[in-house]
Design a protein with these regions (language model features):
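Positively charged n-region of N-terminal signal peptides that target proteins for export
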Residues: 1-4
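Short, linear, compositionally biased motifs with a strong N-terminal bias
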Residues: 10-11
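N-terminal signal peptide c-region/cleavage motif recognized by signal peptidases
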Residues: 14-16
Length: 124
């Protein structure tokens, strides 16, 4: 039992390295999907952090505007990058990642602006 547990833990420990290797050269569509999803999740986490970093720098009016534009952006991203069909739904992860990366860069630029010249809610 201890040997089996040890062997299982070795296999589980090797999975992240295996996944990274697969992302360098996906073997099939499922590997590619895994990698696209991984990149999207990482980009989305960065976006969430950028939002959390920017929001406290803004006055109440700016925070309200940020929330409003963020929700509008989410709707636009979803409309552009996903659709429902009879058998389920389709999400274009490349599109979602590009859109998320663009929004991330926008929020990071607004945060830099707040640090250097002061926050300008009209640019949100």
């Amino acid at each position: 039992m201890k040997t089996l547990l040890f062997a299982t833990s070795l296999v589980l420990a090797a999975l992240p390295a295996f996944a990274q290797q697969n992302c360098d050269k996906p073997r099939d569509d499922f590997d590619g999907l895994y990698c696209l999803n991984k990149v999207y999740i990482e980009t989305d986490a960065e976006l969430n952090q950028a939002y959390k970093d920017l929001a406290p720098r803004l006055q109440a009016e700016g925070r309200a505007r940020l929330k409003e534009t963020q929700l509008a952006w989410i709707e636009e991203r979803n409309a552009a990058c996903s659709r429902r069909i009879d058998s389920g739904f389709y999400v274009n992860l490349s599109c979602a990642t590009r859109s998320t990366r663009k929004r991330l860069e926008f929020l990071q630029e607004r945060a830099r602006e707040c640090r250097s010249a002061g926050c300008q809610p009209s640019k949100l």
